[in-house]
């Protein structure tokens, strides 16, 4: 599985995020408490339950709005049925490329949103995070498509005679 993560065709930051999530190495409040830190374990976004990976990424009412806005609620429910983060990551790796890029961008962006809120910035609405996430996933897919075309030899060469400026 670990090699599959690094072979994903997405930005390295998203690969690193998925790797950390699968390794349970994200600095979640419950994990910090278990390691002996004196922290409030309640999830500061909703103040309803403790901050663990399942609640943060899949079960919190605020993140559910993002999943719904992106028409990924069935995927969210499936991911929520898995236990450890490693199983969730394995399932994500088995998704088709469009769903996979949407899910990876959503999870990564929600982690960034959580960190923004922790630092005192305002919480954005679910539709705002969903719109940002959709655009980002579309950009990743467009880059993948362009790279695929270029690797097959279908791209144009910038140095060709038809595009060179000549001085006569």
Model-derived regions, located:
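Primary recognition of RNase H-like, Mg2+-dependent phosphodiesterase/nuclease domains
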Residues: 1-168
């Amino acid at each position: 599985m670990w090699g599959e993560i690094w072979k994903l065709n997405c930005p390295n930051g998203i690969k690193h995020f998925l790797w950390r999530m699968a390794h349970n190495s994200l600095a979640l409040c419950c994990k910090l408490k278990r390691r002996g830190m004196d922290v409030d374990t309640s999830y500061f976004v909703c103040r309803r339950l403790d901050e663990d990976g399942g609640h943060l990424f899949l079960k919190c009412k605020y993140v559910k709005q993002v999943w719904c806005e992106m028409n990924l609620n069935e995927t969210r429910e499936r991911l929520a049925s898995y236990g450890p983060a490693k199983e969730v990551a394995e399932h994500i790796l088995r998704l088709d490329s469009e769903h996979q890029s949407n899910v990876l961008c959503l999870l990564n962006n929600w982690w960034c949103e959580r960190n923004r809120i922790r630092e005192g910035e305002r919480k954005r609405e679910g539709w705002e995070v969903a719109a940002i996430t959709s655009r980002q996933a579309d950009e990743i897919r467009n880059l993948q498509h362009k790279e695929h075309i270029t690797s097959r030899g279908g791209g144009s060469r910038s140095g060709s005679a038809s595009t060179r400026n000549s001085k006569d």
